[in-house]
């Protein structure tokens, strides 16, 4: 199924004409497909043994080149104050496991600058998640705006890097990571307060709690249990013929239901099946 989402990229320009031109670059059908295919924006990325390290730039390479050319032409013409920067206030990753909690493994997720050849985490924007701790939410906050430039053969921007460690014997998908962010392009750049990478462990979803009403089968079982509990007969104080010693003789004893609240009824009431889990 083709990706049908929309890019969350925003622009910060004072000129309506330049803003419209930049909007066409960012929100064209091709640009939207690139955001999905190259960046996995809003999509689930599966971590497999044959894909143990994943590097996803926050801006597609083709889109990066077109935006950089747009800002450069405006800068050379004296219309813009810089060659352009990309600002990402926050990156949010939702991580879920796809194997048993007994599997020994972990994920290392961090935010580097592609201008750094070593791809080191910027400002300690790095977290490690063990398999038995999942699901979890991870957040990153860059402390600066990244210049739209080319370093060597790399288009400089931020990226999300995911490393899979351990999971011996598991060659398939062990975790799913869904990343979302909002990239802004501007001719101005700034620095921001340092905020450490966040890691929030999330309770697994309780599917049974969503079933607020008993099912048809549960209602049927409940009615049957109630009927069984009400079909009780006890001996009354009627006199029995003491001379009837033959085992073949039948004792005809009336058995009306016990009065509510009587000690005899309470004894039988204690043997009624208990109803649990809403049955």
UniProtKB/Swiss-Prot annotation:
Keywords: Host cell junction, Transport, Viral movement protein. Transports viral genome to neighboring plant cells directly through plasmosdesmata, without any budding. The movement protein allows efficient cell to cell propagation, by bypassing the host cell wall barrier. Acts by forming a tubular structure at the host plasmodesmata, enlarging it enough to allow free passage of virion capsids. It comes from the Viruses. One of its GO terms (cellular component) is host cell plasmodesma. It comes from Cucumber mosaic virus (strain As). Transmembrane segments: none annotated. Pfam families: 3A. Belongs to the cucumovirus movement protein family. This is Movement protein. It is found in: Host cell junction, Host plasmodesma. GO terms for biological process: transport of virus in host, cell to cell.
């Amino acid at each position: 199924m083709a990706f049908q989402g929309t890019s969350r990229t925003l622009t910060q320009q004072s000129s309506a004409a330049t803003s419209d031109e930049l909007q066409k670059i960012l929100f064209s059908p091709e640009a939207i497909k690139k955001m999905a295919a190259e960046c996995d924006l809003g999509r689930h990325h599966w971590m497999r043994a044959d894909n143990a390290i994943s590097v996803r730039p926050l801006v597609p390479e083709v889109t990066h080149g077109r935006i950089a050319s747009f800002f450069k032409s405006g800068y050379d013409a004296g219309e813009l104050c810089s060659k352009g920067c990309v600002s990402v206030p926050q990156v949010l990753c939702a991580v879920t496991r796809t194997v048993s909690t007994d599997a020994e493994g972990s994920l290392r997720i961090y935010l580097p600058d592609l201008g750094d050849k070593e791809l080191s985490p910027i400002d300690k924007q790095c977290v490690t998640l063990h398999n038995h701790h999942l699901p979890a939410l991870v957040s990153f906050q860059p402390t600066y705006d990244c210049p739209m430039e080319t370093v060597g053969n790399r288009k400089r921007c931020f990226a999300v890097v995911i490393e899979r460690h351990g999971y011996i014997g598991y060659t398939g998908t062990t975790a799913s990571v869904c990343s979302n962010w909002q990239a802004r392009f501007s001719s101005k750049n700034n620095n921001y307060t340092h905020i450490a990478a966040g890691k929030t462990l999330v309770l697994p979803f309780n599917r049974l709690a969503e079933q607020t009403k008993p099912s048809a089968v549960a209602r049927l079982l409940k009615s049957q249990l109630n009927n069984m509990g009400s079909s009780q007969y006890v001996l009354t104080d009627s006199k029995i013929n003491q001379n009837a010693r033959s085992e073949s003789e039948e004792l005809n004893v009336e058995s009306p239901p016990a009065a509510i609240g009587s000690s005899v009824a309470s004894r039988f009431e204690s043997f009624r099946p208990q109803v649990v889990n809403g049955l």
